[in-house]
Amino acid sequence: MTWLNEAEVKTAKDKQVKAMAALKQSLTSAVQKHMDEKVKERNYDSILSLCTYATSTAAKFSKEGQAAVEWRDEVWAKGYAILADVEGGERAIPTVDELLSELPSFVWPGA
């Protein structure tokens, strides 16, 4: 007689949840990389690093930091809205390039 270990049983729902988690991880990593790469144009280490300059006493850095905070918020709002639409079956899963093309663009202050 074979015993069934219920902890090892994977349902279709379990597989779907796991696939969605992997998809979210993949797409959110791509969005994060996209933002980090953009700010390296001006020698910032990452979007997080640039955002810390929003409270700088140097006007140039403060403007760039605040612009980055606003852009980051817009990007994540749009990115998570797209993921919610995918989860809800309202749209197909975008490729990374498709996702990135739908995100707001960053414009450096004074550019």
Q: Model regions: which residues?
A:
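A preference for well-ordered globular domain cores
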Residues: 1-111
